[in-house]
Design a protein with these regions (language model features):
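Conserved substrate/cofactor phosphate-moiety recognition/catalytic segment
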Residues: 20, 24-62
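Hydrophobic anchor at the beta1->P-loop junction of P-loop NTPases
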Residues: 7
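Loop/turn-to-beta-strand initiation segments
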Residues: 66-70
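The conserved Walker
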Residues: 11
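Conserved phosphate-donor/acceptor-positioning beta-strand/loop module used by diverse small-molecule
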Residues: 86-107
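Walker A/P-loop
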Residues: 16
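Small-molecule kinase domains that catalyze NTP-dependent phosphoryl transfer to phosphate-bearing small molecules
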Residues: 113-164
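Conserved AAA+ ATPase "sensor/coupling" helix adjacent to the nucleotide-binding pocket
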Residues: 106-114
Length: 175
């Protein structure tokens, strides 16, 4: 059996960026839950038409069967009890709300430019997402991680990605 590492954090915590770098360092496959839930259209995720949870679960199962060593980035990783045994480690990426929200706005501007500003065709959609992200309870991830039986590593998502990757690689290899 391979190794599954779950990176959890609220929107803007940096779990996708960290997950890609960690997967590369370990030679693992990277899976982003956004890719499971939101089909890509014109190289951009279609947030307006998310897949159903069952479809995302099926896609995740396919990924895990094909790539037994993987890093999954997800807010919680709650894909159902059948998936919990797939994770040998879980990582909580914690970042203060103000920083997360700034990252989300910066990322949105990077993706959509002026389209996400007032008057732009993405303005309402992006603002709705920012309100949603800001309203999420800070303990959402922590509470969900308590349901797992694998070790949970806490991480400061404000630190440089390279530093966190090295820390995680040491934690995982040292056990």
């Amino acid at each position: 059996m391979g190794m599954g590492i779950l990176l959890c954090g609220l929107n803007g915590a940096g779990k996708s960026t960290l997950g890609k770098a960690l997967a590369e360092k370990l030679g693992f496959h990277f899976i982003d839950s956004e890719d499971l839930f939101f089909p890509k259209t014109d190289a951009q995720p279609d947030y307006a038409r998310p897949r159903k949870k069952e479809e995302a679960q099926r896609l995740l199962l396919e990924e895990i069967k094909f790539h037994e060593n993987f890093v999954l980035a997800s807010v919680t990783g709650d894909f159902g009890q059948d998936f919990s045994p797939c994770f040998q480690y879980a990582v909580q990426v914690a970042v203060p709300k103000e920083i997360r929200m700034k990252r989300l706005r910066d990322r949105s501007f990077s993706q959509f430019g002026g389209r996400m500003l007032p008057g732009g065709d993405r303005y309402e959609q992006e603002e709705a997402f920012f309100r949603f992200a800001e309203s999420r309870a800070e303990d959402t991830v922590e509470n969900w991680l308590r349901t797992l039986s694998c070790p949970v590593i806490e991480l400061d998502g404000r630190k440089p990605v390279e530093e966190n990757v090295l820390f995680l690689a040491e934690q995982i290899k040292g056990k």
